[in-house]
């Protein structure tokens, strides 16, 4: 488990969405899993700053409809300055398309 992510550092990680939303009702599951994904990333990196989900990742989460979400997703998390406020930092999450999730570990891509 990573303790803190530094400025302009990029980390790729796999998030098990089935585990995150196991207790959610099947109605409006995709909209709630976006909030749960943001909370999971904040908890993983021990950060209290905001998390920005890109359009590609959001479209992937809604690709099977609002009731059926994907089981796992591979994301690339980068700590950047906010577009709204230059003094604040945010965790930006991008979608990483992979063929299989087998034997994928967390890796630091850029520093």
From Swiss-Prot:
GO terms for molecular function: structural constituent of ribosome. SUPFAM superfamilies: Ribosomal protein L31e (SSF54575). Keywords: Ribonucleoprotein, Ribosomal protein. GO terms for biological process: translation. GO terms for cellular component: ribonucleoprotein complex; ribosome. The keyword Calcium does not apply. It comes from the Eukaryota. InterPro entries: Ribosomal_eL31, Ribosomal_eL31_dom_sf. The keyword Ribonucleoprotein applies. Belongs to the eukaryotic ribosomal protein eL31 family. This is Large ribosomal subunit protein eL31. It comes from Encephalitozoon cuniculi (strain GB-M1).
């Amino acid at each position: 488990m990573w303790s803190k992510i530094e400025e302009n550092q990029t980390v790729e990680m796999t998030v098990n969405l089935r585990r995150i939303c196991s207790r959610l009702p099947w109605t409006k599951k995709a909209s709630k899993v976006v909030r749960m994904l943001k909370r999971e990333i904040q908890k993983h990196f021990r950060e209290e700053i905001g998390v920005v989900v890109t359009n590609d990742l959001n479209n992937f989460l809604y690709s099977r409809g609002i009731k059926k979400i994907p089981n796992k997703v591979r994301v690339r998390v980068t700590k950047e300055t906010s577009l709204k406020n230059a003094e604040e930092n945010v965790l930006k999450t991008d979608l990483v398309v992979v063929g299989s999730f087998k034997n994928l570990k967390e890796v630091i891509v850029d520093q």
